[in-house]
Amino acid sequence: MTGYEAWLITFGTWMYSVNKEQLARAGFYAIGQEDKIQCFHCGGGLANWKPKEDPWEQHAKWYPGCKYLLEEKGHEYINNIHLTRSLEGALVQTTKKTPSLTKRISDTIFPNPMLQEAIRMGFDFKDIKKIMEEKIQTSGSNYKTLEVLVADLVSAQKDTTENESNQTSLQREISPEEPLRRLQEEKLCKICMDRHIAVVFIPCGHLVTCKQCAEAVDRCPMCNAVIDFKQRVFMS
């Protein structure tokens, strides 16, 4: 009997909203108390399931250090779950879009680390979201590199400045070289300013230190929030 089969048996006549086969595949078994379940590997427990909740996503959300989860889904999946959580608060919903289009765009944009990087470089969230939406609608896919995204954002800013001929105040002009220079600086650890950033702090979501410096801090150097978990990320 495989691990999956053994875990599945524990659910018996499971009558709750989440599919028991999906729960078993995600490494969970039922403990016989209402809808409470537990991971066979990390021991993490979950309960109070809501309809359409994904067991893998909940596993990654609450127990990102689980080795079984890491083996089955990989670093990128776990990183995307936590980056999505940290960015969802910045989403401005618009009633002009259909629900299906809004879902498609949010599913494509928010797991993308380039969004957070562009925000950290000083670009406005609404401008980034708008240009990513246009990219998806015209080409069917999102940006592949941060450099191309930055170049298009700078170009859009220049077009906006030229069209607003009646402005009464001068706008600071960003040269094409400046964002690229800042991009290189933004990739550096904000503590040692030597190695590349490689760790995202949970729950605040800030990505500001290399692996070595992250091991030496208990609070986020950006917002001073207590760090509950340190998740390794791999930037391209």
Curated annotation (Swiss-Prot):
One of its GO terms (molecular function) is ubiquitin protein ligase activity. PROSITE patterns: BIR_REPEAT_2, ZF_RING_2. InterPro entries: BIR_rpt, BIRC2-3-like_UBA, IAP, XIAP/BIRC8_UBA, Znf_RING, Znf_RING/FYVE/PHD. Zn(2+) binds at C39, C42, H59, C66. Keywords: Apoptosis, Cytoplasm, Metal-binding, Zinc, Zinc-finger. It is found in: Cytoplasm. Pfam families: BIR (PF00653), UBA_BIRC2-3 (PF21290), zf-C3HC4_3 (PF13920). Gene3D superfamilies: DNA helicase RuvA subunit, C-terminal domain, Inhibitor Of Apoptosis Protein (2mihbC-IAP-1), Chain A, Zinc/RING finger domain, C3HC4 (zinc finger). GO terms for biological process: apoptotic process; negative regulation of apoptotic process; positive regulation of canonical Wnt signaling pathway; positive regulation of protein ubiquitination; regulation of cell cycle. GO terms for cellular component: cytoplasm; nucleus. BIR repeats lie at residues 7-70. A zinc finger (RING-type) spans 189-224. Binds to caspase-9. Protects against apoptosis mediated by BAX. Belongs to the IAP family. This is Baculoviral IAP repeat-containing protein 8.
